[in-house]
Amino acid sequence: MEVFTIAAVFAFGTIIGSFLNVCIVRLPEGRSIVHPPSHCPACHAPVAWYDNVPIASYLMLGGRCRSCRVRISPAYVVVELLTGALAVALWERLGPSAAFAGYFAFAAALVTITFIDLDHRIIPDVISLPGIAVGLAFSLVSPLVTPLDALLGALGGGGVLLGVATAYQAIRGQEGMGGGDIKLLAMIGAFLGWQSVFVTLMVASVAGSLIGIALMIYQRADAKLAIPFGPFLACGALVHLFFGDRILAFYFGS
């Protein structure tokens, strides 16, 4: 891609990332994502447009509110950078197409879910349930999956985790996986097809185990420490989106 195109796509992604930050903060609290306009969560001062430029405004303000000087979480910039990078990566793979629009929306939903789950230990139905429907509808024009793949992915993704959660609760007598994770994997399957369920779960399980072990070693965390699984599922889905074909070919020797 030309440098100008990369810069434009990245800038577009960061603008969407700025909006995702609003969703991440407001959706768990049941607040509107369109009103009121952006404001400081500490002093409630409105954020002027020139203080709301993705990444740049954070750096120019030194990571603090212009009005009250309270520190702004660096997570805002991380979301904007991540969304911008995903936009560039998807544009590189899919180009200017309906596929780019659909899978960028999917990636944006995964970013939103990841940071909400990290902060609140929930995955809002307002994202995952419409996401399943959108994924199934998008399969009609997607170059990566067929409608049958999407349907089997949604049913298989949700069904696999539902079975795991049911078995865990029966054996251990406690909930081991929330309903949000089940619906998230169903959404992933709807967008990426039934083959994605294998890669997503493999990556999520390995990454989750490594992080859990690291926390127990370095922070002396309890073995029963609850770690949100949604971010690992989202990570696994993105790995499949970009590398799934090669992973499956390597794993099955084809």
What feature does the model see in each segment?
Residues 1-28, 125:
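Long, highly hydrophobic alpha-helical transmembrane signal-anchor segments
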Residues 9, 99-207, 249-254:
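Functional transmembrane core segments of multi-pass inner-membrane proteins
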Residues 20, 24, 86, 90, ...:
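Alpha-helical membrane-inserting segments
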Residues 20-75, 229:
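Membrane-proximal soluble regions of multi-pass membrane proteins
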Residues 21-27, 62-70, 110-120, 163-175, ...:
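C-terminal ends of transmembrane helices
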Residues 72-79, 125:
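Select subsegments of transmembrane alpha-helices in polytopic membrane proteins
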Residues 178-180, 213-239:
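Interfacial loop-to-transmembrane junctions
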Residues 195-225:
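Conserved post-catalytic alpha-helical subdomain immediately downstream of the catalytic base
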